[in-house]
């Protein structure tokens, strides 16, 4: 599913490198294109998540109805994401990440919606450079999925931009994910001082301090990439 989200982000970045957003019409075209990308790759993410869910059920010797792929983002949801991203920053990567998140959302919604239907448990599994918020969620361990686990009973609430973490499911309390230790994450969270919000902020500052060089290198690489794309776009429209 990560590849689908990455491809969606790349398509949006490429589009913005050749289509400056100047007028309201330009924004409407961007939203329309983003919606088509979110739909196409969101359907793929949902279908893949459904296949994985069915495979886990089969390996667990649990008989449940075939998983139903979740619906992809609506045009209204896409518009809110794109407009919000553009208000936050004109950086193409920010908009690309927002659309990428919509793709991932379809996959995570599929996992949780079917888990709720079948009374399964889910856990938030960290991956990559895990942020403070995701560490906090991972510390909760395996929990029975209910309507409270889903925003408005539909959407997974934990999805944010540039996140590689995923929901894992298990049936009847059996099974685990290799390397996932919720107690370890809980101790990381518990060891920080203050209120829950202060604990998360402390974890965030600690993670940034530990990964400062890598984060800055990533930012420089992204900036260089944008400059290259903008240069290529300028060459394409150059009039002799």
Predicted segments, located by residue:
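Domain-core detector
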Residues: 1-160, 169-240
């Amino acid at each position: 599913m990560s590849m689908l989200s990455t491809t969606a982000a790349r398509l949006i970045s490429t589009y913005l490198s050749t289509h400056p957003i100047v007028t309201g019409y330009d924004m409407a075209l961007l939203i329309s294109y983003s919606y088509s990308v979110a739909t196409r790759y969101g359907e793929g993410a949902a279908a893949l998540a459904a296949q994985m869910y069915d495979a886990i059920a089969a390996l667990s010797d649990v008989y449940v109805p075939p998983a139903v792929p979740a619906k992809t983002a609506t045009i209204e949801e896409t518009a809110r994401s794109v407009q919000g991203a553009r208000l936050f920053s004109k950086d193409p990567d920010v908009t690309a990440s927002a659309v990428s998140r919509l793709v991932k959302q379809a996959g995570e919604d599929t996992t949780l919606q079917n888990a709720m239907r079948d009374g399964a448990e889910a856990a938030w599994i960290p991956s990559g450079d895990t942020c403070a918020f995701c560490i906090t969620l991972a510390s909760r361990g395996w929990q029975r999925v209910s309507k409270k686990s889903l925003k408005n009973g539909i959407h997974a609430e934990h999805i944010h931009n540039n996140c590689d973490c995923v929901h894992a499911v298990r049936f009847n309390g059996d099974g685990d994910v290799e390397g996932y230790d919720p107690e370890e994450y809980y101790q990381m969270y518990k060891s920080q001082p203050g209120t829950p919000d202060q604990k998360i902020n402390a974890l965030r500052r600690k993670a940034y301090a530990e990964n400062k060089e890598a984060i800055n290198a990533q930012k420089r690489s992204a900036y260089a990439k944008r400059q290259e794309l903008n240069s290529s776009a300028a060459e394409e429209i150059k009039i002799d």
